[in-house]
Amino acid sequence: MSALDKPSVSNHFLGVVDAKLTSLRKSLEGFGSVMVAYSGGVDSVFLAFMAHQTLPGRAVAVIADSPSLPRSELREALQIAADFNFPVRVLKTAEFANADYVSNPLNRCYFCKHELFSQLVPLAKELGLAVIAYGENASDVGDFRPGAEAAKEFHIRAPLKEVGLTKAEIRALSARFGLPTTDKPQMACLSSRVPHGEAVTEQKLGMIEAAEGHLRSLGFVDVRVRHHELPGAPVPSMSATNPQLNDLTAPPTKPALARIEVGATELPRLLEATNAARIAEELKRIGYAHVTLDLLGYRRGGANDLAPQPVG
């Protein structure tokens, strides 16, 4: 039973959520027209849906097509837009042409969002849309979010945060409106699988996407494959035994270790000898020199657990 179905315990919750929903609708109406930075995640799907419901014909979602977005996520995001009949545009972004992004500093997300917003601003002007909005919510307040700094620079609005909607409330409202992202796990971009300080490359992200795709095809839900460079001689960027991944024009990369994280409840199944052996075999075919399992399971920011720490 969802939070919205519980009669007594949820009365206060329902009242608070309904008040915030009313505020969100008023806020969107006040925009007059809006472009929504869309990713296919819980927050942006809900925001794009509400914008379309509140401002029919005056709201457009725009999704950034980048190597850091898995192809499956792009397809799913476009399908949701089609199913709920809200307009969406696909925009190619070029953050990988920026050395500051590729070097993967702690504020990498700033450079990604800066690239996105620098393209959205002229597009919104071209389409005659008054406001650009994105899916930051009230639960994000206090987190280290470099992308929010870029949003401030470009005067991007965060209506979910502005009306105080939390992640749990957005999920509850998504369930009310029948959105398929209600229970969708958080899905950070593929670049988040590479520890800060190790370069982010399209070749690495291709390996990560293929590895995570394989695990999800086996039924694992909360999945991260952390990509760690190893010392040693360069190797081909993709396994020569996997033509779909192999890019002969790409420069050689350092050998890499895959550190698999799955949800705590999924660990026992992955540890089954047959599963473990098959997964290791497939990830080596993708190009990983070593395949390991993190016994602590999935956790946010896990890519940096093995990153070099500053002295002192």
Regions found by a protein language model. Name each.
Residues 2-176, 233-240, 244-245, 250, ...:
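ATP-dependent adenylation/nucleotidyltransferase module used to activate substrates
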Residues 73-74, 186, 271-275:
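Residues at alpha-helix caps and immediate loop-helix transition turns in enzyme cores, especially N-
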Residues 164, 202, 269-273:
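Ordered, soluble secondary-structure elements with a strong preference for glycine-centered loop motifs
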Residues 165, 171-215, 219-231, 235-238, ...:
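Mid-to-C-terminal catalytic subdomains of enzymes
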Residues 206-208, 274-277:
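Charged helix-capping and loop-helix junction motifs
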Residues 255-272:
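A short interface-forming secondary-structure element
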Residues 294-301:
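A short, acidic, flexible beta-alpha connecting loop/helix-capping segment that sits on the rim
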Residues 301-312:
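Short, low-order "capping/linker" segments at domain edges
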